[in-house]
Regions:
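Beta-rich strand-turn-strand
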Residues: 80-115, 119-121
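A positional/architectural concept
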Residues: 1-50
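Flexible glycine-/small-residue-rich
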Residues: 26, 46-48, 55, 114-118
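Compact, glycine-rich, soluble single-domain proteins
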Residues: 48, 56-93
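Hydrophobic residues embedded in beta-strands of well-ordered beta-sheets
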Residues: 51-52, 110
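Enriched for short, Lys/Arg-rich terminal
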Residues: 119-137, 141-144
């Protein structure tokens, strides 16, 4: 089960990514296994040499009534100290943002792909959409070239 933040690629330039662990409660893990998680509005902050993710929505687990946590509580991310220092330098010096890109299982553990991102302006978004559309048209033309039989060739056979 992979939960992806699709808006992140549209709204940000992704400079670098880090795979990190995340501290969760038991009912939150069960909700994530069921696919009841949303990364769209979430972001990361650095506080006292630790990294936290805010606003990550994990819906409450149905079968656990009293043990459910708040849906958008602050969750701690697990990284090496060297990685945290490098991320902190990048965020402070370059003015970058920490954005969760993907939540997935690696074995029996849940991992979060954390991206160090720079925000896109509206003209950047339009340019990337144009580039994507052009690439799609090129692929369509190549596909048609290999799989479409020219009409003149068909007339020659009959």
């Amino acid at each position: 089960m992979e939960i992806e933040n699709r808006q992140a690629k549209h709204n940000y330039f992704i400079e670098d990514t880090y795979e990190c662990g995340i501290v969760l409660k038991g009912t939150e893990i069960k909700s994530i296994r069921a696919g009841k998680c949303n990364l769209r509005d979430s972001y990361g902050i650095i506080k006292a040499n630790e990294i936290f993710v805010l606003n990550m929505f994990i819906s409450p687990y149905k079968e656990a009534s009293i043990y459910n946590e708040s849906e958008t509580r602050t969750r701690k991310l697990l990284l090496h100290k060297k990685e945290i220092k490098k991320i902190a330098q990048d965020v402070e010096q370059k003015g970058l943002t920490l954005i969760p890109l993907k939540l997935y299982f690696k074995g029996d553990k849940i991992k979060l792909l954390l991206g160090i991102c720079r925000g896109k302006k509206n003209y950047d978004k339009r340019e990337s959409l144009k580039r994507k559309d052009e690439q799609r048209q090129i692929e369509k033309a190549i596909k048609c070239k290999y799989y479409c039989v020219p009409v003149m060739f068909l007339y020659c056979l009959f």
